[in-house]
């Protein structure tokens, strides 16, 4: 397959390098278009007030294009401008840190895959439950095996497959679990400190309370040791809410 590969940790991150190797070793034709700098948690932001610049990276068997923008920028630019032959699949990852539950909304990794899906391409987002991974070669090979089955062919358009790996070797993981995202949200707070010039700064931290997790959710199963798979569908309107509001307000939805 011809694959567009991107991420949000940046083009020099371990995750994208090891996923690239897994895909290349499996015989795929891979074009990398990824942010030059760290873009974690930028969501689906795009750049509209400054130009995007592209730099080629060729090193240690890796070849890719670094883009001075967000993950969604990378996908949009690649699919409209950089790629002469359009891809069969958009893959984003492997992210350093899981993207489960509400993290899906914050994630540049998932948003890059979503941009691909919105533009009409099958898309897979891949993350590892480890904020400082040093070796994701096994996970990269797993992804190559996973996409060989072309699971997206059974799905509706604009669907993203969200794949997450637990922090353990592949041989020690529990079976792949198909599961919904947790509905639990973070308890957030900011740590306030002072810089060397005496000015306050604020650093976000937070946790999802374990007691708020349902046992069948992505976060709970990932923590238990499963590889998790969640299909995400980005339909912007809530059909049930449309019907409820129509009844409540006496409005028609067919005008």
UniProtKB/Swiss-Prot annotation:
Keywords of this entry: Cytoplasm, Hydrolase, Metal-binding, Nucleotide-binding
Origin superkingdom: Bacteria
Main subcellular location of this protein, as a coarse class: cytoplasm
Enzymatic class: hydrolase
GO MF annotations, alphabetized: 5'-nucleotidase activity; metal ion binding; nucleotide binding
UniProt-listed Gene3D superfamilies: Survival protein SurE-like phosphatase/nucleotidase
Cofactors named for this entry: a divalent metal cation
EC number per UniProt: 3.1.3.5
Cofactor note: Binds 1 divalent metal cation per subunit.
Keyword Nucleotide-binding: yes
Binding positions for a divalent metal cation per the UniProt entry: 8-9, 40, 95
Protein localization: Cytoplasm
One Pfam family recorded for the sequence: SurE
InterPro entries: SurE, SurE-like_Pase/nucleotidase, SurE-like_sf
Reaction catalyzed: a ribonucleoside 5'-phosphate + H2O = a ribonucleoside + phosphate
GO cellular component: cytoplasm
Task of the protein: Nucleotidase that shows phosphatase activity on nucleoside 5'-monophosphates.
HAMAP family: SurE
PANTHER family, sorted: 5'-NUCLEOTIDASE SURE, PHOSPHATASE, PUTATIVE (AFU_ORTHOLOGUE AFUA_4G01070)-RELATED
Protein family: Belongs to the SurE nucleotidase family.
Protein name per Swiss-Prot or TrEMBL: 5'-nucleotidase SurE
The species this protein was found in: Solidesulfovibrio magneticus (strain ATCC 700980 / DSM 13731 / RS-1)
Gene from which this protein is expressed: surE
């Amino acid at each position: 397959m011809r694959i567009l590969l991107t991420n949000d940790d940046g083009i020099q991150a371990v995750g994208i390098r090891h996923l690239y190797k897994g895909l290349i070793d499996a015989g795929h034709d891979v074009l990398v278009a990824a942010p030059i700098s760290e873009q974690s948690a930028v969501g689906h932001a795009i750049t509209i007030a400054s130009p995007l610049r592209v730099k080629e990276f060729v090193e240690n068997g890796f070849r890719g294009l670094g883009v001075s923008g967000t993950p969604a920028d990378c996908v949009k630019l690649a699919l409209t401008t950089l790629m002469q032959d359009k891809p069969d699949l958009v893959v984003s990852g492997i992210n350093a840190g899981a993207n489960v539950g509400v993290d899906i909304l914050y994630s540049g990794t998932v948003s890059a895959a979503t941009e691909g899906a919105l533009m009409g391409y099958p898309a897979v987002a891949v993350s590892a439950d480890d904020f400082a991974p040093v070796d994701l070669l096994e996970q990269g090979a797993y992804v190559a095996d996973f996409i060989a089955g072309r699971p997206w062919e059974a799905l509706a358009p604009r669907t993203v497959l969200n794949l997450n790996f637990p922090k353990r070797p592949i041989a020690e993981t529990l079976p792949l679990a198909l599961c919904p995202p947790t509905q639990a949200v973070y308890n957030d707070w900011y740590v306030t400190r002072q810089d060397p010039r005496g000015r306050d700064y604020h650093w976000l931290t937070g946790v999802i309370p374990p007691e708020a997790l349902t046992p069948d959710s992505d976060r709970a199963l990932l923590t238990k040791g499963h590889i998790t798979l969640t299909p995400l569908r980005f339909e912007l309107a809530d059909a049930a809410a449309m019907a409820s509001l129509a009844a409540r307000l006496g409005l028609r939805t067919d005008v």
